[in-house]
Every structure is written in structure tokens, then in C-alpha cells.
Regions:
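PLP-dependent enzyme catalytic core of the Aspartate aminotransferase-like
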Residues: 2-255, 268-276, 290, 301, ...
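N-terminal alpha-helical interaction blocks
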Residues: 260-262
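Conserved PLP-enzyme active-site core in the AAT-like
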Residues: 266-501, 507, 623-625
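A generic structural signal for well-ordered coil/turn residues at beta-strand boundaries
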Residues: 502, 532, 561-564, 591
């Protein structure tokens, strides 16, 4: 169990965390101020959500690269592979303000190597792929960074900063840099820096101390075991580990059972028994897994529009809209939308047969959706996909595979490991799982094996492996806590005293599209076991109640979800501030408060929400006085 935590404006969430995923925005006004660029808020931001706020270590490294390689008036973005950098260049070209004169973009490869190999963690060079462009095109590059989640991680940046000097001069080009057993081929614009470590800046010094402590006291694998950590992650996600108990690792020469050759493997618990670790692919973020699922479909299937089924996380929809031919949006995600989808498919392909091109590329849906927690009728969608030949991609982040089994209905399942799989809110990650029983599995698998770049930074994988060891236990606690809180809040949605209700709606799988959710409930869970996940949203009958409730909540407040501590945000404000009316048309109200419940003591949580409701009631009384 964890204690209820709070944090001041602009500070990392969790506190004192160098690579925190969230940032504290503790009041409604703070969130509005952030969206409006209010100086009071912006100047307080020490960090932010990594795809929206570029971590300061990455900013520092980018500034060095701009001085070393850029021309006057140029800025850059940093990536971990040439392929990703080329994707960025293509996006910037395609989205140039003037198609007749596209933004000039150039790529440089910069290889950062240690001067002396003193530990396994120092044995690998880091390839930086620098995308340089005119400064006024930065917003376009930032959109690519945000939508795809394929930029370098903050740990990558810190590791690079420890291996190079912050010097404005160009690095030395070497044909045979020291400490390299094998010199990679040296194409044009490939540069190397190999230097003895300069005096280490404080942030990087703290990073090295943290890495030492994590390894020395058994919480993390040594960095030399990154391959084993990634193997453990793939097995954990595939659901093939018969025993997945990781104790403290004092013997650093011993691989953990989950990632070692001695691991006992069995049939998958994911609802498709023949899934293996080879069907699981790791990505640096959840959004990059979603981007690659869509890109994989574009590579293997006839070019058609996609379908976004339900109201999804904002960047998921942007991917479907901005890459490929576009998408149809069925934003409510209800059975009535499936009726409309059937009509659309008939209109697009009136005489469709199995030999005909599919009328759409993929159908993407979240199970359940964010933030309305609606669950699609997956069996019915699967039947449509089999009839029409399109792919189904399901994002299981919110349901998670402890609670729900969606793989039998999907061709591809994606997830943000950053969320509840990690729980600690200190590392990013994503996964993509192929269904080996899917009709298009062979084509998807062979193409992905050819196209896949392992750009998940080793240190991030190490932290993700450590964090996820108690994943199942955390989920069980979170399930129970969230159900108790939601039952409590819902009791205020219908009045027993003759007064108007305070709570308008509690969006939670137990209460929303319950039948569809239960259809996919994990088979080995007992009927009386809580399994609805930790996320819910709540709306109030008056906007003043939303403001007061949120401001009075004594918990962490900021973006993200799935944390081991309770985390809340005014979701529509931070995700759709520039399109509030559009979101409202899909039922995502301006006053919606989204809450990700943590592992705190249940009674303590209920007390916190009781106080927040009392504040909401007081605000309404004052308004009506």
C-alpha cells in the first residue's frame, strides 16, 4: 500500500523523480493556465508529460547538437534510428505549410561512445539521429514527436550527456574510435564523439548514483542484462511464464528466471494459447506501438481509410487522420455505431466477397475507452472484420490483460506499458502483440520482423522490467479500491432526500456497457473478484461542483494514468482545450474529472473522496444561495 500524496505546481509526479512521467497541476485554474500559456504556470513547470513537454535533459542535448551540426536559425529533433528520423522528415515534408516549397530537412547520424569501457553499461555506443530544420518549422516536428512517441527518452539523453562534453565545437571525426571492437560503416553525415568524461553535471551524476543503487541493492538488473530484461518483458506480456516471481537480485551474475533460459514457459494466458514471446514487440512508448500497428497495416494491406471506433485518446485519432488515406470516426462506440458501420461497409463495397479488397484498412478501438470507459462489442466487430477482410487493432491499456482478454478478437493488441504495467510513473514503454490465429498473421509477422527497429533504450527496459514484477498484485489492489470509490460516488448520483443529485454520471466499466466488458473478462477470474480496472471519470450536475471537487481532492493531480498512487486530472481541459465543443458533442463534457485510482488504503481513499464531495456540495450551495 502507498500513502496518499500531493505535490506543488509544476513539480514532478512522483516527487524527486528525475524521469517522472507526470507533472503536478493541482487546481482547475492551473490546468486552464497551462493550456493558455499563463506565465505563472508555464514558468513553474520543472517537467511535464514526455510527449508534450520535452525533458530538460533532451533539450540540453538537442541544444548541443544544434551548435555542433546546425546552421544559423536551425533547430533539431533527436531519434534513435535512421528509419525514425526518415519518418520525421517525411511527416514534415508532407505537412509543410506550402506544398510547393516543402520544409528543408536534413539528417545527421551522431555516434556517442565511451572513452573507456569500465562496466557492461558502458559497452555500447549510442546512435543519435538528428533531424535538422528551420526553427519556424519546429511546431511541425513537435507534432511528429507528440503523435508518434518515437523521440529519444530522457535516460538516453542523460547517458549521452555523460559521454560527451558540452562544447560548441564539432566532434572529432575518427576512422577508428577507441573502445570500439567493430567500427560501423561510415556513411556521409555520420560523426563520432569519443571523450574522457568531463566533470559530470549534477543531473547526470545523480543518474549514475541511482543506477548503482538500483543494481547494488537488487531492485534492477545490471544494465548488461538488458536483453534478458526485454525477454522477461515479452514473456510477461505474452502470458507464458508459469512462474513469474522475481526476488531481489543480489547475485548480479544470475539472470532472473523470467528472462533466463531456465524460465518455465507454458501456454499463454492471453486467451490465445499459442502466443509466444516472439509475437510481442517492444516500443519506447504506447503511442509508438499504435503508430507502428497502423503503419504495419499500411505496409501489408490495400490502402483504404481506417475506422476509429469510440472516443479515443486524442493522439490515437491523430495518427489515423494524419497518416494514410484518413479515417471514419464512430465516436460513441455503441452498438448503434456498429449498425452505422455495417451500412458504411455495404456502401463502400456493395458486392463484397472474400476475394475483394477490404473496404477499410483497420478498425481501431480502446477497451475500454479513455475517458468514457465504454467497451465495444468486440465479438460483433470481429464478425464484421472476418466478413469484410479488415484488421482490428485493440488498445488494452486501460482494461489491461489481467482483467480482460481481448486478443481473441483482435489481429493486433497494443498497450502503453507506461501506465499500470509499470505503475511507478518513471519510465515509458509500449507493446504490440500479434494474434497468431489471425487470418493475416503471416503477412503481419513477416513484415514486422523485417521492419522492426529495437529502439527501446536498454536502461528504460531495465526499469520497466523491475517495475512490472508486481504488476498483477498491484492490479488486484487497484481494482478493489476503484470499485469501492466508484460505488461510493455513484450513491450521490440519485437523490434519496428529494434534493437534486450532485453527481451526474460515473463512467466506469461496472456501470457503462457492462455486458460488452464482461464478455471479455479474463476467464480464470472468479465471478466475485473485482476486475474493472483503476480508471474512472465523473461528471457533476454543475460545473462549479467539478471545479470544487477537483481542487479539494487530496491526491496527486496531473496527466497520465495507471500509477500506483491515485492521480486525477480535468481530462477534457488538458486533452481537448482547443476543441471543447467537438469533445462535448461526443459526450466528453468540459467538467469531466478523470481519476486513476492507486494502491492506497481503501478507507483513506474513501475519506479523501468524501471530503472532495463535501467541497462540491458546498460550492453548489454557495452558487444557489
Amino acid at each position: 500500500m502507498t500513502a496518499i500524496m500531493t505535490q506543488t505546481l509544476g513539480q514532478p509526479v512522483p516527487p524527486f523523480t528525475a524521469h517522472a512521467i507526470s507533472v503536478s497541476l493541482p487546481t482547475w485554474r492551473d490546468n486552464v493556465g497551462y493550456e493558455e500559456g499563463e506565465k505563472r504556470v508555464v514558468n513553474s513547470m520543472v517537467t511535464g508529460y514526455p510527449r508534450f513537454f520535452i525533458h530538460k535533459s533532451i533539450q540540453k542535448l538537442a541544444s548541443i547538437c544544434e551548435r555542433k551540426f546546425g546552421s544559423q536559425g536551425e533547430r533539431c529533433m533527436l531519434f534513435s534510428s535512421k528509419k525514425t528520423a526518415e519518418f520525421c522528415r517525411e511527416f514534415m515534408t508532407n505537412h509543410s505549410p506550402n506544398p510547393q516549397s516543402p520544409v528543408p530537412v536534413r539528417l545527421i547520424e551522431f555516434v556517442v561512445c565511451p572513452d573507456e569501457i569500465t562496466a557492461p553499461s558502458d559497452s555500447r555506443c549510442i546512435d543519435l539521429h538528428i533531424v535538422l530544420f528551420p526553427a519556424d518549422a519546429f511546431p511541425i516536428a513537435k507534432k511528429f514527436w507528440q503523435h508518434t512517441g518515437m523521440g529519444i527518452s530522457s535516460r538516453t539523453a542523460v547517458r549521452c550527456l555523460t559521454r560527451m562534453s558540452d562544447s560548441p565545437t564539432s566532434p572529432t571525426k575518427r576512422d577508428h574510435p577507441p573502445a570500439l571492437n567493430r567500427l560501423p560503416s561510415k556513411p556521409q553525415n555520420r560523426h563520432y564523439v569519443v571523450k574522457s568524461p568531463p566533470p559530470i553535471p549534477r543531473e547526470e551524476e545523480v543518474e549514475d548514483v541511482n543506477s548503482y543503487l538500483e543494481e547494488r541493492y537488487g531492485r534492477n538488473l545490471p544494465l548488461g542484462y538488458a536483453a534478458a530484461a526485454k525477454r522477461a518483458l515479452r514473456r510477461r506480456i505474452a502470458g507464458v511464464l508459469v512462474h513469474d516471481q522475481c526476488n531481489n537480485i543480489q547475485d548480479t551474475q544470475r539472470l532472473p528466471e523470467a528472462g533466463g533460459d531456465e524460465a518455465v514457459l507454458g501456454p499463454s494466458s492471453r486467451g490465445v494459447e499459442n502466443v509466444t514471446e516472439d509475437d510481442v514487440f517492444l516500443y519506447p512508448t504506447g503511442m509508438s506501438a499504435i503508430w507502428w500497428a497502423h503503419h504495419l497495416a499500411l505496409l501489408t494491406r490495400p490502402q483504404q481509410k481506417s475506422v476509429c471506433f469510440g472516443f479515443p485518446y486524442t493522439d490515437s485519432l491523430k495518427i489515423l487522420e494524419k497518416w494514410g488515406p484518413g479515417c471514419y470516426h464512430f465516436g460513441h462506440g455503441l452498438d448503434s455505431d456498429i449498425d452505422a458501420l455495417e451500412k458504411l461497409l455495404e456502401e463502400l463495397s456493395p458486392n463484397h466477397s472474400l476475394s475483394s479488397p477490404p473496404p477499410i484498412l483497420i478498425l481501431f478501438t480502446e477497451f475500454p475507452s479513455n475517458p468514457l470507459l465504454r467497451s465495444a462489442n468486440l465479438p460483433r466487430l470481429r464478425a464484421l472484420a472476418d466478413k469484410s477482410g479488415f484488421l482490428i487493432v485493440v488498445d488494452e491499456t486501460i482494461g489491461n490483460f489481467v482483467n480482460v482478454s481481448v486478443l481473441p478478437y483482435a489481429d493486433i493488441v497494443v498497450s502503453s506499458l507506461t501506465k499500470v504495467f509499470s505503475g511507478d510513473s518513471n519510465v515509458m514503454g509500449g507493446s504490440l502483440v500479434l494474434n497468431p490465429n489471425g487470418r493475416h498473421y503471416a503477412a503481419l509477422k513477416s513484415t514486422l520482423q523485417k521492419e522492426f527497429d529495437d529502439i527501446y533504450f536498454d536502461e528504460d527496459a531495465i526499469f520497466m522490467e523491475r517495475n512490472s514484477r508486481n504488476f498483477r498484485r498491484r492490479v488486484q489492489t487497484i481494482n478493489e479500491n476503484a470499485e469501492a470509490v466508484c460505488d461510493f460516488l455513484r450513491s450521490f448520483s440519485s437523490s434519496t432526500t428529494g434534493e437534486p443529485p450532485l453527481v451526474k454520471e460515473v463512467y466506469y466499466p461496472k456501470f457503462i456497457t457492462r455486458e460488452n466488458y464482461d464478455t471479455c473478462r479474463t476467464a480464470d477470474l472468479a465471478p466475485n473478484v473485482s476486475a474493472f480496472g483503476g480508471l474512472f471519470s465523473v461528471t457533476f450536475t454543475q460545473l462549479a461542483a467539478s471545479h470544487a471537487f477537483f481542487d479539494a481532492l487530496e491526491c496527486m493531480k496531473g496527466p497520465s494514468l495507471g500509477t500506483s498512487f491515485t492521480l486525477a486530472c480535468p481530462y477534457t481541459i488538458i486533452a481537448h482545450y482547443g476543441e471543447l465543443d467537438w469533445a462535448g458533442n461526443w459526450g466528453v463534457e468540459k467538467g469531466l474529472v478523470r481519476v486513476s485510482v492507486g494502491t492506497e488504503e481503501k478507507d483513506e481513499l474513501l475519506s479523501v473522496f468524501k471530503k472532495a464531495l463535501e467541497a462540491a456540495e458546498a460550492a453548489v450551495r454557495t452558487l444557489n444561495a
